Amino acid sequence: VSIEPPDPTGTTTSTPSSTDSSPAVPDPFSSTRPWAMQLAMRDERASRPAHLAVCEAAASAVVRLLTDPRSAPGGEWYPFVHHWASGPIRKVVRRGRGVTFTRIQELAGAEVEHAGAQVRAFVPGPVDQVPAALAKMQVGGTDMPERGEPSAPVEGGITVALTPLTPMTTGKSAAQSGHAAQLALGEMTGDEQLLWEKSGWAVRVVTPDAAEWAQAVRTARVAVRDGGFTEVAPGTRTALAWW
C-alpha cells in the first residue's frame, strides 16, 4: 500500500488510469534517501530579519506543525510526520525572497511570523523528493548580519540556548532551535504542553557565554546533539531547552 504525499494545493487527487500519460507521483516511503523537515525563511533585501528572530520563529513553526491536528493519528500528515520522527529528526533550512517565497505558501505546512521574521515548516519527506518550488530556494550560507535580541520571556513558553562554543550560521542555528523545541514538546507533561499552547508556542532563544552555557548544561531539561551532517562535528551539543 502506498500513501500519496499531502496535496499542497488542498485539491482532490486521483490515481492515474493505465491510459493516463502523466508521470506517476513517486512513493516517498519507497525512497532510500534520508527524510527531513524542510523550513523556509523569508529574506528580503530591504528588511532582513535578525538571527535570533529567525531561530525563534523556526522553533515555533516546527512545534505548530507537529501539534497540528493533521499531524495526529488519523490526520493526513500523520504517516509522514510519524515516519520522519521515528528516525533522525533532520531539518533543512532554506531562504528565499519575493515570488520565490510566495510560491511556497501553497505547500502543506505551518507558518510563523515573529519579530520581523517569517518562517514556514513543511510536512517532512525524503530529501530527493522536495517540491520544485521549495527546491529552488537556497540552502547554504544562510546567515543574518544582525544578531538581534531574545524575545521577552512568556509564561508557559520555553527557552532555547544555543552553544557559544561552536560557530553556527543562522540556518544551522534555526534548525537546532527547531530540534530543541521538538524535543521539549516530547518531554513535557500534558499540563506543560497546554501551558505552552496557551502561550502561542512561544520560544525564547538565547546565546549564553561559556560560563552560563556550562551551568545550563547541568540544569537544562533537554539537549540536542547534532548528527554532524553540516557545520559541526557529529555529537556536538548544539542547543539546550528548559521551561
Across the structure, where does each feature detected by a protein language model lie?
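Positively charged, small/polar-rich N-terminal and surface patches that mediate targeting and assembly
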Residues: 1-203, 208-211, 216-217, 221-243
